[in-house]
C-alpha cells in the first residue's frame, strides 16, 4: 500500500472513541488523558508511515499502542529502579539509599505539621538548622555546623563568606570537576572569590602557597580529589602544614572533602579516605562535604568548623536561597542518629552496609538468585562468578570491592537486547553488559528484588 493511502487509513479520534475498549478506558480515566493518548498513538503511526518504516497497520494496532501510551502517561515519571550494576552510590540512580529511621522521620514530618522553625520550649520562632546542628557537632566534633542544599552550594557559601572580592589560594592539582560539568573554578567564580592557582598538576609545595599570600588573600583552600587519583611523581601539602601556614598569616583554612565520610574505611581494609573528624582534629577552620555520598543520607551540603565562621555564614543572604527543606532535614537527622554508634551506622545505613558487607555473604545470595532464575526461566544460561563492585558517586576512585555476580546469556537473544528489555520493563532493572553476558551484581540488590528479576526475565522471550 502506498504512503498516501496509509495516511488516509489512519483512524480519526472520534472514530476510535467509539471503540468498546477505548470507551472502557474513557470511563476509568479523564477524557483529556484518553484523547491525548489517542492523538499520540495516531501521531506515532503517522510518523512511522512518513519514515517508510511500515507498509501496513490495523485499527487494532493503533488501539494497542494507545493502551500502552495511556498507561505510560498515567505512570509517574520518577520511577523505582532495581540497581544490579554493583555501583553502590550510583549518581544516575539517586546515589545513597536512606536508612529506615531516616525514611520514617521524613514520613512523620511530611504528613504532619512540624516544629520546622518553631521553638517549642519558648513558643517563639526558631531555626531550622537547630534540629541537626547538635547532632552534626556530636558526630564530627565540630564547634558549629550548618546545612545547605548540596556540597557545591556549601563551597560557594563558605567562599563567599570568607573571601568575597578577595583571593582564595588553591593547588592546581585540586581544581576538580565534580560532575555534570560543575567545576571548582566555576563555583569559586560564582562565590565572587578570586582564584589563585599554585603549584602544578602533580606537585604542590608549601612555599607555593606562602609565596602567593598577600594583603588581599582571604582563605587557603584545600580540595580533596575524591573522584580521581594522581599516581607517581606527586606531592601535596598536608592539612597540618596548611593550618600552620594559615595561623602564621592569620588566614582561615578551608577544606572541601567532597564525599564526606565519617567512618575510617581503612579499618575495614580499604584505602584511607580523609574523614570529617580527622580534618577538624588537624585544625582546619571550615570543612564542607556531601550528605548523599559516603554519609549515606539525603542530598545536602554540610558545613562544619569554627563557630565564628559558621555564624557569619548563617547571616549571609545566600543562606536563604540555599537552605534545605523539612524533608531533607528530617532525612539527615535520621541518618546522623545512626552515627552515634558506628556499628549501628554500618548495620542500618544501606550505603555503608553495601560497601562493607563481605563477599561471602554475596556468594550465597548470588547462588540463591541463580537457583530462582534456573528454576523459573527457560532458554537462558546462568552462572555465579566472582567480580568487582564499585563505590561510585565520585568516591574512593580506583577502589574495587570483591563480590559475586550472576552472569546471564542466551542463544535466543543478545546481551544488549536483554539489557534494553530489562531497562524498559515495567520494573526497570539496570544491569551491566560485558563480553556478551548480562551481569547482575547482588551487592546492590535486595532480597525483595529477586522475585521481580525472575518475573521480568520470564517475559524477555515473549
Curated annotation (Swiss-Prot):
One short Pfam name that applies is Se-cys_synth_N
Query: Where does the source fall among the domains of life?
Result: Bacteria
Q: Which GO terms describe its molecular function?
A: L-seryl-tRNA(Sec) selenium transferase activity
Q: Which coenzymes or cofactors are required?
A: pyridoxal 5'-phosphate
Query: What reaction(s) does this enzyme catalyze?
Result: L-seryl-tRNA(Sec) + selenophosphate + H(+) = L-selenocysteinyl-tRNA(Sec) + phosphate
Q: Which SUPFAM superfamilies match?
A: PLP-dependent transferases
Any idea which residues bear N6-(pyridoxal phosphate)lysine here? Answer: 293
In its UniProt record, which GO terms are filed under biological process? conversion of seryl-tRNAsec to selenocys-tRNAsec; selenocysteine incorporation
Keyword Heme among UniProt keywords: no
Q: In which pathway does it act?
A: Aminoacyl-tRNA biosynthesis; selenocysteinyl-tRNA(Sec) biosynthesis; selenocysteinyl-tRNA(Sec) from L-seryl-tRNA(Sec) (bacterial route): step 1/1
Q: Which Gene3D superfamilies match?
A: 3.90.1150.180, Type I PLP-dependent aspartate aminotransferase-like (Major domain)
Cellular component per GO? cytoplasm
Q: What is its EC number?
A: 2.9.1.1
Q: Where does the protein end up?
A: Cytoplasm
Keywords from UniProt, A to Z, are: Cytoplasm, Protein biosynthesis, Pyridoxal phosphate, Selenium, Transferase
Q: Does the keyword Protein biosynthesis apply?
A: yes
Q: What does this protein do?
A: Converts seryl-tRNA(Sec) to selenocysteinyl-tRNA(Sec) required for selenoprotein biosynthesis.
Q: Which NCBIfam families match?
A: selA
Family statement drawn from the similarity comment of this UniProt entry:
Belongs to the SelA family.
Indicate what this protein is called per its UniProt record. L-seryl-tRNA(Sec) selenium transferase
Biological source species? Clostridium botulinum (strain Okra / Type B1)
